[in-house]
UniProtKB/Swiss-Prot annotation:
Lineage: Bacteria, Bacillati, Actinomycetota, Actinomycetes, Mycobacteriales
Keyword vocabulary terms for this entry: Ribonucleoprotein, Ribosomal protein, RNA-binding, rRNA-binding
Record function comment: Binds to the 23S rRNA.
Species of origin: Corynebacterium jeikeium (strain K411)
Family matches, as InterPro entries: Ribosomal_uL15, Ribosomal_uL15/eL18, Ribosomal_uL15/eL18_sf, Ribosomal_uL15_bac-type, Ribosomal_uL15_CS
Keyword Secreted attached: no
UniProt family annotation: Belongs to the universal ribosomal protein uL15 family.
Protein name per UniProt: Large ribosomal subunit protein uL15
Database matches in HAMAP family: Ribosomal_uL15
């Protein structure tokens, strides 16, 4: 019985690993043109990936982007009056923190209340913004509206 094979004794079979040809390193081994043929752009330098053989390239065919992104834009978390009625059916005071705790909006972002749906519960709502119809519906139900800064 022979010795067991050890990991450090493993070698590739003879001829299994062929050394890569180093081109352009002397006349004997693919020197001079190094497999690029003779003359022409591709023999002299690398052609850029954007070059399309003289056709108008894609990045020049497409239109430029116009306009800009307003850095002062405020994106509000939207909550409807009907959502407030479902979440706070007992009535009372409702703040932005309460709306976030109820899972109606994300925290650390301003909240705007919109007037979609109906409300019959008396709520004293404090939020960052209100639509006109939301104000009317909340006040018609006997509640109050306060805009927080």
């Amino acid at each position: 019985m022979s010795d067991p094979i050890k990991l450090h004794d493993l070698r590739p079979a003879p001829g299994a690993k062929k050394a890569k040809t180093r081109v352009g390193r002397g006349e004997a081994s693919k020197g001079k043109t190094a497999g690029r043929g003779t003359k022409g752009t591709k023999a002299r330098k690398q052609v850029s990936a954007a070059f399309e053989g003289g056709q108008m390239p894609l990045h020049m065919r497409l239109p430029k982007l116009k306009g800009f992104k307003n850095p002062a834009k405020v994106t509000y978390q939207v909550v409807n009056v009907s959502d407030l009625e479902k979440a706070f059916s007992n009535g009372g005071d409702v703040t932005v923190a309460d709306i976030v705790a109820a899972g109606l909006a994300r925290k650390n972002q301003p909240v705007k209340v919109l007037g979609n749906g109906e409300i019959s519960v008396k709520l004293n709502v404090t939020a960052n913004k209100f639509s006109g119809s939301a104000k009317q519906k909340i006040e018609a139900a006997g509640g109050t509206v306060t805009e927080a800064k």
